[in-house]
Swiss-Prot record:
Its main location: cytoplasm. It comes from Prochlorococcus marinus (strain SARG / CCMP1375 / SS120). GO terms for molecular function: peptidyl-prolyl cis-trans isomerase activity; protein folding chaperone; ribosome binding. GO terms for biological process: 'de novo' cotranslational protein folding; cell division; chaperone-mediated protein folding; protein transport; protein unfolding. Residues 457-467 have a biased composition (Basic and acidic residues). Consists of 3 domains; the N-terminus binds the ribosome, the middle domain has PPIase activity, while the C-terminus has intrinsic chaperone activity on its own. Signal peptide: none annotated. Residues 439-467 are annotated as: Disordered. This is Trigger factor. Belongs to the FKBP-type PPIase family. Tig subfamily. Keywords: Cell cycle, Cell division, Chaperone, Cytoplasm, Isomerase, Rotamase. One of its GO terms (cellular component) is cytoplasm.
Length: 467
């Protein structure tokens, strides 16, 4: 009970939600009704009366008591809500919801009687960790693979290659084939959507198309026609095509190949800002080593965080989940826009609804990760040293010297969050165990070696097919 008049009682609900139960005395209800009536009298424009001089009895007759009661009830709810926030120290995450709805409440509202009403709202969750130490988890190690340096150099050579016609030989792997083709499903002969093309350029590289397609073209001669048997993978993105066998009627119209530049210092100068092939190799080696180190660190951190989340006890409020879902959808939209896609036509109502549903698990995981780290900082009293913070802010400002209108308040918050996260992961690594998980594969993320000064010299614009 907060005072002798208005009675306020709070009750915890599931999903970090609270109910605020009010018992509003009859006198307060009556006062609210009288205030609403007085306000209408002052603002009403009725024929035969001066503005502000309309008698209350006339207002009641012309407008009706229910409309006045509705206005009184709205003002009353607003007032008691603000009072509850102040007296009960409530920090809501969203606007209050009236239990039972407004219309039923209005129907039973009598300004001469005590009013019982309940408002509900989401509040910040209180995360708790069952334990923070002695956890055991696994992380896949990422190591530097020197063969990737050669792969990146070969990729640059391909980008700088001259495309020349092929004569008097069949198609080989790594050639560029100009094809006209039509695909049908083997089981019913129906045409494959997106499975046809005319005069389309295709790189004859393994894994570029569905299994059997490239292999069927290798060995063909210019102007030769052929039917190729293929099968769509079971995990193919198109549900209609998954695992189905297909036939492609193909005509090889033309054939080209790449003439690669010599692997020497001139190539290094053309492919990058380095003066020699040795310098280029050293730069690529350092980049790949740095990338492997960073990915290894990220793997370890993600593994520790996943283990910590398993120890988390928290109820997630719908408000925070919905907010994070919106953030994920907005990020998806930005990614699409960066790829040149038309957001307005792409993001239909059906797609947005689908994304809202499919993004929910990821949104919940993101929230739990953040809350787990917050709970760790609280439980173990992990803080950012003020001197370290100031030094880092100074360092970042030097790096951003050429940028204008930097929001220093936001910058401070970002830097502080980054430093705190680093300290939290250092603490987790020092107090828990990470076992080495057998790697699925070596590092195969491609790091761009350089910014080529010249693009690949092609006689026609390359087109990509969908199979």
């Amino acid at each position: 009970m907060s005072n002798s008049q208005l009675k306020i009682k709070t009750k915890a609900l599931p999903n970090s939600r609270i109910a605020i139960e009010f018992e509003v005395p009859a006198q307060q209800c009556k006062t609210s009704f009288e205030d609403a009536l007085t306000t209408l009298c002052k603002s009403a424009n009725l024929p035969g009366f001066r503005k502000g001089k309309v008698p209350k009895s006339v207002i009641l007759q012309q407008i009706g008591s229910k409309r006045i009661q509705a206005s009184a009830l709205e003002k009353l709810l607003e007032k008691i809500w603000k009072q509850a926030l102040k007296e009960e120290s409530i920090e809501p995450l969203c606007e209050p919801e009236l239990a039972g709805g407004f219309e039923p409440l209005l129907e039973n509202f009598n300004p001469e009687q005590t009013l019982s009403v309940t408002l509900e709202t989401d509040v910040a969750p209180i995360p708790k960790l069952k334990t923070t130490k002695g956890l055991t988890t696994e992380a896949e190690p990422i190591t530097f693979d020197e063969s990737k340096v050669d792969e990146l150099i070969e990729e640059s050579r391909k980008q700088l290659a001259t495309v020349i016609p092929v004569e008097n030989r069949p198609a080989n792997h790594s050639d560029i084939a100009i094809l006209t083709f039509k695909g049908t499903f083997a089981d019913d002969g129906s045409e494959i959507e997106g499975g046809s093309g005319e005069s389309m350029e295709i790189d004859l590289e393994e894994g570029r198309m569905i299994p059997g397609f490239i292999e069927g073209i290798v060995g063909m001669k210019i102007n030769e026609t052929k039917t190729i048997d293929c099968q769509f993978p079971k995990d193919y993105q198109d549900e209609k095509a998954k695992g189905r066998k297909a036939k492609f009627d193909i005509q090889l119209q033309d054939l080209k190949t790449r003439e690669l530049p010599k692997l020497d210092d001139d190539f290094a100068k053309q492919a990058s800002d380095k003066n020699s092939l040795k310098e280029l190799r050293n730069e690529l080696t350092n980049r790949l080593k740095s990338d492997a180190k960073n990915r290894n660190k990220k793997n370890r951190q993600e593994s520790l965080l996943e283990a910590l989340v398993k120890e988390l006890e928290v109820d997630l409020p719908k408000t925070l989940i919905d907010e994070e879902v919106r953030n994920l959808i907005e990020q998806t939209a930005r990614n699409f826009a960066e790829q040149g896609m038309d957001i307005k036509s792409t993001f239909t109502q059906d797609l947005v609804s689908s994304l809202m549903e499919s993004s929910r698990p990821e949104a919940e995981i993101n929230l739990k990760k953040n809350l787990a780290l917050n709970a760790l900082a609280e439980a173990e009293n992990i803080k950012v040293d003020s001197q370290a913070l100031e030094e880092k802010i100074k360092e970042v400002n030097i790096e951003l010297a050429n940028q204008k209108n930097i929001d220093q308040k936001k910058l401070r918050q970002v830097v502080q969050n980054d430093l705190l996260q680093e300290k939290l992961f250092d603490w987790l690594e020092a107090n828990n165990t990470i076992l080495e998980k057998k790697p699925k594969k070596a590092l195969n993320e491609k790091v761009k070696s350089s910014k080529p000064k010249n693009t690949q010299k092609k006689t026609d614009k390359t087109k990509k097919d969908s199979p």
